[in-house]
Amino acid sequence: MKFHEMGQTDLLEATNTSMKQGLTEKEVKKRLDKHGPNELQEGKKTSALLLFFAQFKDFMVLVLLAATLISGFLGEYVDAVAIIAIVFVNGILGFFQERRAEQSLQALKELSTPHVMALREGSWTKIPSKELVPGDIVKFTSGDRIGADVRIVEARSLEIEESALTGESIPVVKHADKLKKPDVSLGDITNMAFMGTIVTRGSGVGVVVGTGMNTAMGKIADMLESAGTLSTPLQRRLEQLGKILIVVALLLTVLVVAVGVIQGHDLYSMFLAGVSLAVAAIPEGLPAIVTVALSLGVQRMIKQKSIVRKLPAVETLGCASIICSDKTGTMTQNKMTVTHVWSGGKTWRVAGAGYEPKGSFTLNEKEISVNEHKPLQQMLLFGALCNNSNIEKRDGEYVLDGDPTEGALLTAARKGGFSKEFVESNYRVIEEFPFDSARKMMTVIVENQDRKRYIITKGAPDVLMQRSSRIYYDGSAALFSNERKAETEAVLRHLASQALRTIAVAYRPIKAGETPSMEQAEKDLTMLGLSGIIDPPRPEVRQAIKECREAGIKTVMITGDHVETAKAIAKDLRLLPKSGKIMDGKMLNELSQEELSHVVEDVYVFARVSPEHKLKIVKAYQENGHIVAMTGDGVNDAPAIKQADIGVSMGITGTDVAKEASSLVLVDDNFATIKSAIKEGRNIYENIRKFIRYLLASNVGEILVMLFAMLLALPLPLVPIQILWVNLVTDGLPAMALGMDQPEGDVMKRKPRHPKEGVFARKLGWKVVSRGFLIGVATILAFIIVYHRNPENLAYAQTIAFATLVLAQLIHVFDCRSETSVFSRNPFQNLYLIGAVLSSILLMLVVIYYPPLQPIFHTVAITPGDWMLVIGMSAIPTFLLAGSLLTRKK
C-alpha cells in the first residue's frame, strides 16, 4: 500500500487502529504473531570451523595436498610433512584475516531504536521498539530515532535527518498531508518517518505502517544479503595459474615415467623422478607468500589511514577503473557552512568550512574587518540570536547539537567575533515563535542591555520578501521597491546557481516592553539580507580526483541531492567535464539494466538516487568490464558497497552498516586517502608479479635441470627434498622481500590494468622461460663438470648443483625488481631484500655444512675451490641477459 497517498481516515481504516485508544494488548499479540518482531533478519553466519576449512578450497592448495598424498605414498615423508606445514600455516593466516567478516546485518539491526512511546489501550507507554506492530500509534520528539516506518498524522515544526538513508545532509521538513504525486523517491516522501532516521527538530505523532523487513531499512537489508561477493582479479589470476601448473606437472610426470621405463629404468625410481619434477613445477610457497605480501601491504596501508577488512581486496584497488563515490560526507564534509553573506547591496565571502569558528571575511577579494561593516555585523549577530542550536568543542572536534543550517549561521557569527558568551551576556530572548513548515520561518523577540527590543526573523527568502516593506540599503532602511526586489531576486538566482541554500534574515525594532503576537511580529519587516549555505567539498578531494584521472580512473558522484546541487559540487571539484552528463533518479527508473549499461560511460553525476539505483549503477559499470570501487558512509550505500569489486567506507562518519559491508575503511574519512590506497594496491600487484616471475623462473630452472639430466641419461642432479627446500625456504624469503619493494615512480601515471589481464601479460611469460632456461643450463653444466670429474661421488655433484641453483636464483631476484635491467634500480633501496638474500645464503651453508642436516638433504661439504665454479656459473644467467639488454639499448 502507498500510505503516503492516503488521508488520515483511509489510513486509520487501512491499519485498523484508533488515534484515541491505539491498539489493545490482545490485538498487539495477534499482529506480532502475524508480522513478527520489529527486527531486521540476520543472514546465516559461517561457523569458525567452516571458515577455517574454507581456506583449503583454493585450487593451488588442493594441488599441494595432492602432492602431499603422492609423496607420502612413495615414502617421502619429509616432503609430505613439509608441504602439509605450508598448507596449514597458509590456512591459519587466511582464517584470522577473514574472522570478522559478514556482520553487516547485525550492525544494521543495531541502528533500531531500543524504546519508543506508543499508545496502547488509551495510555502512552514506553516499549521496546521490537514490540511495535503495524497500526501502533507512536509519538516522537527532537533527538529521537524513529523505530519503524511511520505515516505522520501530526507534525509540529517537525524535521528529520535522513542522510544515512537517502544521502541528503539537510533535514527534511515533514508534514501530515497526503501526497498527490504517485511516483516519488524516498527523499521526497515528506509525510513519512523511516526506521533509523533521527528527529532534529519539533515533534510528531504517526501510525506505524511497516516493521522489520517491511521497512525502507529492511529493503536495504534484503539487498545487502542478495548483493553478491565477487572474487578479486588476483584470486582469478592465481586460480588460472594453479590450473596451468597442475597440467604442466601432470604432463611432466607422465613424460618422465614413460621415457624412463622405455630407457630401461625401474618404475619406482622413475615415479620418484616424476614426483620430483611435479614438485619442481609447483611453487609450494606461492599461496603463503601471496598472503604475506598482501598482509604487508595492509600494514603499510594502516600507516596511511586505510584499514583493510578483506585481504585479497587490497590488490583490487590497484586495477579499479571506476570510483563511484557518495557525495555527502565523502566528497563533502556533511557540515553546512555559510560561504556568502549579502546585505546592503554588497556580497561578502566567508572562508573556512565546518563548525570550527575559524575563517576570514572578504569583500571584492580583499580581506576586511567585520567591525567596519555594519550590515555584515547585523547579519551575523541576528543569525546567532534567531537560533536554537549549539556548537561545543569535544575531544578536539567542534560538534553541533541541533539543526545543520542553524549550525552554519552560528559558526559564521563566531567567525565574526560574536561568541556564545557575548551573545548570552548582551541579549535576552523574550519570546520565540518556532519554525514550522507552513510559515517557513522562525521568529524571536530579543532585548539588549539598553532594554531595546528587536523582532528577528529568519526563513525562506520568498516568504520574508513578502513580509518585508523595507530593505536595509546604504546604511539605512529604505523602501523595498520593485527595483530592490528585482535585485534581491537576481542575487538569489546567482546564489542558487552555485548550489547554495539561501536563508533570509529580516528585523524590526519595537518599543521597550512590547511583546507582539506572532501575526503582528511577522509583518512590516525590514529585509536585512541573505546567507548562502552549502555542505562544502573536502579541500583535498579536487587534487585526489585529478590524480585519479591521471591514473586512468574515472570518478563518478552518486548522491540523493538535487541535480543543481550535485552539478555545482561536481564542477567545483572539476569532476564534470564539458561533455559529461548528469542523470537523475527518474531517468534511471526509465532505463533497464541493459540500457543503462549502454549510456553509463558518459555519465559523471547521478542525482536524486535511491539505494536500488546505486546498486543498478555499480552493476552497469561491472557489466561493461570495469573494476568498480564504491565509496560511501551511509546505510543507503551498503548494498552498492557490497556489490562493488571493492567497497570503501568512512571510518568516522560511516555507519557500522557501511563499514561492515566494505572491504576498505578510510580511518580519516578523507577521500584523498583512496588515492594512496590505489597507489599501494597497484604496487602490491606489481610486487606479486615480481615474485611470481622470480618463483616460476626458479621452477623452470629446476624442471630443465631434471629434464636435461634424463635426456643425457645422467643421475638426478637434485633430490625431491632439495627442490622442496629451494621452493619453500631459499625462494620464500627473497620472494617475501620483493613483496615489500617500493613503488616505481610512474605507478600512478599508468592506466589501470585490464581486469582480464593474465598473470603472464606484459612479457612476463618470456622472462620466466628465458631466465629459467639459463638458470637450468648453468646448474646442469656445474653438475656435469663435477660429476664427470668423480662419478662415484654423486652426493657431491648433487650438492654442487643445489648450491649453483640457489645462488643463481638469489642473483636473479635483483633482476626481478625491474621490467628492464638489474642495473636500473639501486639494490640498497630494498634492505629487506638484501637481508633475505644473505639469510638464504646462510641457510644454504647450514644445510651443506651442518652434519645432522646432511643426510636429510643429501648434501656434503663443498671445497673452497669448487665455490669459484658455483659462483661463476650462478652469475652467468642474470649478467648475460643484463649485458644483452644493455647492448640492445646502445
Swiss-Prot record:
| Membrane topology per record | Multi-pass membrane protein
Which Gene3D superfamilies does the annotation name?
Calcium-transporting ATPase, cytoplasmic domain N, Calcium-transporting ATPase, cytoplasmic transduction domain A, Calcium-transporting ATPase, transmembrane domain, HAD superfamily/HAD-like
Active site at which residues? D326
Positions with a binding annotation for Ca(2+) 1: N699, E702, T730, D731
Provide the membrane-side ranges marked Extracellular in the record: 69-78, 259-270, 709-718, 783-798, 850-864
Q: Which residues lie on this side of the membrane: Cytoplasmic?
A: 1-47, 100-238, 289-688, 740-759, 819-830, 886-890
Q: Which residues bind Mg(2+)?
A: D633, D637
Look up the EC number in the record and give it. 7.2.2.10
Q: Which residues bind Ca(2+) 2?
A: V279, A280, I282, E284, N727, D731
Q: What does this protein do?
A: This magnesium-dependent enzyme catalyzes the hydrolysis of ATP coupled with the transport of calcium.
Q: What is this protein's record name? A: Calcium-transporting ATPase
The organism encoding this protein is: Bacillus subtilis (strain 168)
